[in-house]
């Protein structure tokens, strides 16, 4: 866990609850695990990301409510574009366009990637943007 992730997720109320429940020391050790100024994807994260055949994406609606959607496809559906950026093709899906619509007004997202057989996971937070492959080919290649 990077310190940046912990700073965003461990709000004052979360920290207080960790203290009350006795997990604050362990959480503090995890929060300092990585270089605090380094939010780049490392080789381990990159390998984990590209080995996935599905993930969950959470977006925030205009009403402020979270929305979680599963995305699946062939292994490698998530592409590591650089040390700070991943991408994926959003296939037709259920044609409700809730995630894409949410991203149009609120770019904050959370991705949850799971390796079920090995009981490993990776949580990512960031900002998303929708790129139309038909009109902005350079951005997606």
PLM-predicted stretches and their roles:
Residues 1-141:
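Binding-site signature for planar aromatic cofactors or substrates
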């Amino acid at each position: 866990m990077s310190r940046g992730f912990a700073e965003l997720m461990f709000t004052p109320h979360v920290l207080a609850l960790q203290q009350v429940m006795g997990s604050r020391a362990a959480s503090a050790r995890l929060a300092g695990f990585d270089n605090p100024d380094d939010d780049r994807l490392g080789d381990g994260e990159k390998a984990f990301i590209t080995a996935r055949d599905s993930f969950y994406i959470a977006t925030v609606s205009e009403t402020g409510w979270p929305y979680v959607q599963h995305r699946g496809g062939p292994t490698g559906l998530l592409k590591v574009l650089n040390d700070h950026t991943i991408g994926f093709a959003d296939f037709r899906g259920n044609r409700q366009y809730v995630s894409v619509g949410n991203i149009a007004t609120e770019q904050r997202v959370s991705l949850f990637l799971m390796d079920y057989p090995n009981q490993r996971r990776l949580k990512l937070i960031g900002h998303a943007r929708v790129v139309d492959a038909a009109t902005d080919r350079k951005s997606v290649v």
